[in-house]
Amino acid sequence: MAHAAAATGALAPLHPLLRCTSRHLCASASPRAGLCLHHHRRRRRSSRRTKLAVRAMAPTLSSSSTAAAAPPGLKEGIAGLYDESSGVWESIWGEHMHHGFYDAGEAASMSDHRRAQIRMIEESLAFAAVPDDAEKKPKSVVDVGCGIGGSSRYLANKYGAQCYGITLSPVQAERGNALAAEQGLSDKVSFQVGDALEQPFPDGQFDLVWSMESGEHMPDKRQFVSELARVAAPGARIIIVTWCHRNLEPSEESLKPDELNLLKRICDAYYLPDWCSPSDYVKIAESLSLEDIRTADWSENVAPFWPAVIKSALTWKGLTSLLRSGWKTIRGAMVMPLMIEGYKKGLIKFTIITCRKPETTQ
């Protein structure tokens, strides 16, 4: 009994997650209720503060969501979050720290979810028309925001390519290199701490530039895409899979106050700067003279994934792992219901953007 009481007390910080998540899981049975990971509850802002937030967060191409200096402590916060949480994720979900891709309405088991994460990689490559043939397949790949390197190792095995990953998290870089060694890929794959806005690579080095769910962390979206283009070789394909907010209607100057408030609460937990829309990314790519620009909304295709993440967090293994990891990870787990809400409202869009760097002028 004493042990049970102690365990119950230790789980007290997660009681709000348990209450909120049970409600949202019931409401998210529809495959249209796509999901993601983020934020703890806060009191409502006054109407005056909400108006200020509208002005501060208006996500237009000229706003801070597409061109801004990093807020103080942002990089350190991102690094700390992933230093703390990556081990928890790997212990439950494995080496791929991104969504899975599913057919609409598909029901899936845990093994299906892991296959769906691989499918996300393959669907992204197919959408970008990355060639498989020996002459044209990628030989050199950069993985920007690499996590613990799951995508890099997969691409190295698939193409025989040299893959280089960067992350703000020293823990992730170290773990990625350790996994590469375990899998016999140390000669093909390497990871280092690096800033996506100032990549430690020369111009034109890579014929595939890959960013799987890291763009949402970038305070300056234009600089982010510009750096992806800089390190791309002439003719190289650039793939960005990221979280966006919905496109604005022609009559709108910004998102609605309640939408901005929801995103702000998510940002606070996940060390995210202001969000932007898919159309913002298209405008940035066009302004950089990138070619073959394509986008798609895959929100419905990721719908089954986050209900499974939530359920795994509510297992004994998940709950005890969260408690051992630290407050940043717990706070992130507590915002999952807000991400569910954002997807259900059509506010959050799981987006792929692909483009190509022009060939060298003859």
Curated annotation (Swiss-Prot):
GO CC terms: chloroplast
This protein's source sits in the domain of life called Eukaryota
Q: Which PROSITE patterns match?
A: SAM_GTMT
List the catalysed reactions: gamma-tocopherol + S-adenosyl-L-methionine = (+)-alpha-tocopherol + S-adenosyl-L-homocysteine + H(+); delta-tocotrienol + S-adenosyl-L-methionine = beta-tocotrienol + S-adenosyl-L-homocysteine + H(+); gamma-tocotrienol + S-adenosyl-L-methionine = alpha-tocotrienol + S-adenosyl-L-homocysteine + H(+); delta-tocopherol + S-adenosyl-L-methionine = beta-tocopherol + S-adenosyl-L-homocysteine + H(+)
- According to its UniProt record, the EC number is 2.1.1.95
Transit peptide location: 1-55
This protein's record includes keyword 4Fe-4S: no
Pathway assignment: Cofactor biosynthesis; tocopherol biosynthesis
Q: Which GO terms describe its biological process?
A: methylation; vitamin E biosynthetic process
Q: What is its main location?
A: plastid
The entry sums up its family as follows: Belongs to the class I-like SAM-binding methyltransferase superfamily. gTMT family.
Q: What is this protein called?
A: Probable tocopherol O-methyltransferase, chloroplastic
Q: Which organism is it from?
A: Oryza sativa subsp. japonica
> Which parts of the sequence are annotated with region: SAM motif II?
204-212
- Single annotated GO MF: S-adenosylmethionine-dependent methyltransferase activity
What this chain does, per the record? Answer: Involved in the synthesis of tocopherol (vitamin E). Methylates gamma- and delta-tocopherol to form beta- and alpha-tocopherol, respectively.
Gene symbol here is: VTE4
